[in-house]
Structure formats: C-alpha cells, structure tokens
Swiss-Prot record:
Keywords from the UniProt entry: Aromatic hydrocarbons catabolism, Lyase, Manganese, Metal-binding
EC number(s) recorded for this UniProt protein: 4.1.3.39
Transition state stabilizer, annotated site positions: R16
Lineage start: Bacteria, Pseudomonadati, Pseudomonadota, Betaproteobacteria, Rhodocyclales
Active-site feature positions: H20
Pfam families from the UniProt entry: DmpG_comm, HMGL-like
Disulfide bonds: none
GO molecular function, one term: 2-isopropylmalate synthase activity
Domain Pyruvate carboxyltransferase positions: 8-260
Name by which UniProt lists this protein: 4-hydroxy-2-oxovalerate aldolase 1
Record-linked InterPro entries: 2-IPM_HCS-like, 4OH_2_O-val_aldolase, Aldolase_TIM, DmpG_comm, DRE_TIM_HOA, PYR_CT
GO BP annotations, alphabetical order: catabolic process; L-leucine biosynthetic process
Amino acid sequence: MSLRGKNVTVHDMTLRDGMHPKRHLMTLDQMVSIATGLDEAGIPLIEVTHGDGLGGSSVNYGFPAHTDEEYLGTVIPKMKNAKISALLLPGIGTVDHLKMARDLGVHTIRVATHCTEADVSEQHITMARKLDMDTVGFLMMSHMNGAEGLVKQAKLMEGYGANCIYVTDSAGHLLPEGVKERLGAVRKALKPETELGFHGHHNLAMGVANSIAAIEVGANRIDAAAAGLGAGAGNTPMEVLIAVCSLMGIETGVDVAKITDVAEDLVVPMMDFPIRIDRDALTLGYAGVYGSFLLFAKRASAKYGVPARDILVELGRRGMVGGQEDMIEDTAITMARERGLKV
C-alpha cells in the first residue's frame, strides 16, 4: 500500500532509552548538545529522563549523573521548536514526579506499564489529563500479549484519559506480521481521535521494518533514536527511519542530512561501546527479553562465570519483565551453583 503523503510524528529516544547503554551518566552538556541538534534537524518530540523514567534513580536501576530536574530544567529552555516528553513507570515514578515534570515545561507524559497491567496506570494518566498534558499510555513488552489482550489493555488506558496509546516492542522480538496484527487490532478498537504509536528495538534488525509496518496499519507516532542509541542493540535508528520515510513519501518534517549529522557527529562519539547486534543483544530479541537487562546480564556474567547469553535465555524462559532487574543476579547465582561454579 502507498503511504505517500501520510504524516508521522517521530519521537526521539536518544536521551532516555539511550541512557541505558550510557549507564544513565550523560552529562548536561551532552544532553543539551544532542537535544539542540535534534531540534535543529526538525525532530518534534524528544524524551528526556533517566532510562527507567522519572524517579528511576536507585540501586536497582542505576544512579544518574544528574537528577531528572537538572536534565529537564537544562534542556527545555534551549528548545526552539521541539517539545520535551518524559517517561513514567507507576511504582517507580510518582504523581509528584509528574507534577514536577509539568512545572518544568514537559509537554508529553508517557505512562508505561507491562502489557497486561494497564490498570496500574489509572492514577497517573488521570492526573496527567487533569494537568492538560499530552498523555500517552505505553504498553511494554507487547510480544507477551496477543492482539485481543492488547486491545483490552489499550481500551483501559484510553478510558483513563490517554489521548495516544503505544504498543511497545521492548524486547525487539516482534516481526512485521506480529506488529501489524497487534497494532491493527488496537487501531480498530480505539476512538478515531486517539492516536496510536509504536516503539521498536533493533535486536533482530527489524526496527525500521516494524515501524513501517506499524504506519501501514495506522500508527502515527513512531519512536527512534539517533544512531540507534538505546537498550540492547538499540532503538530503531532514527536517521535510517527518516531516510526510508523520505523515500516512501511519508512526511516527518525531519531533514535527512541534519539527523544523519546528529547521529554521526554527536551520538556515535559519545558511545561507550558500539551499539550493534552482538550475540547477547540478538539473544534479547530471539528470547524476548527486556532490552535494559543486557548490561545487567553482562555484569552478572563477569561476576559469576555464567555466559550472559545463557542468563538471558533463562530470564526469557522465566518470563521476567521490566522492573525485575534485581532478579538477574539471583538467576545468575542459581545458574552458577547448578553448574558447580564458585559463588
């Protein structure tokens, strides 16, 4: 089908999902440099927070170089056209965090839950709407729920007041057919005025293909990150997505050359290691494991002598989901003991 002339809002993840491979240690100067570059390139919406959202600073998830208030308060005044969003996971972020973000000028709040637990988002979505924010319901790990189940969860979030619903491939596990099945069903079930979004990861190199598949069935918000900087093998690479959209006639309002320069000149030099599909990132996608588990598994591997790939496969077998990072070390210890390794 032709998508020529279709308008899509691209939402940048470099400064939020990209915090995972940076161990949440981006400097304020790095944040401002990349955000202003994205703004200049025409990116309309940029997410800025700890990798695990507002309030994510903790022993479990990692301590950032600066507070959410410092990151947001530094970046927002520098924006000429782009709006700033923030992620919030109920149980990590609170209503007070939400109000703080709004007072600092955050435009969009994305309330994220596991794809079967939308009911825990009611308080935060309701409050965000009362504060007149662009309010997004964000269903994570969507490969773990079928189309019918996702429809029920999406309708809950819409009922709480969300004006946009995201179906999120947190593990980079879905293929285009699975994306179309899930997002197509959700699109048909939502009110016409409720927007639909897709967030992809590149663990099986499907980020761009899945994003186009999502657009084909009605998604009009698409997440991506410059140079793919994000958890696992990264998010959908923004510069590649923009180039493909341009070739297909999909309107994003983003300059291909400028976003490519942001990726090449600003983001790649900042990487602590190459964001690529190595064997462990591939295992994330293949086994359907939450993307931010990757570095935790690698650290546990170095500590206990169990290959990270084996740990990730076991986490997938156990059905571990985002928020259970503390179980990764426990799993590695159990596996090491079973293999007769010294713990």
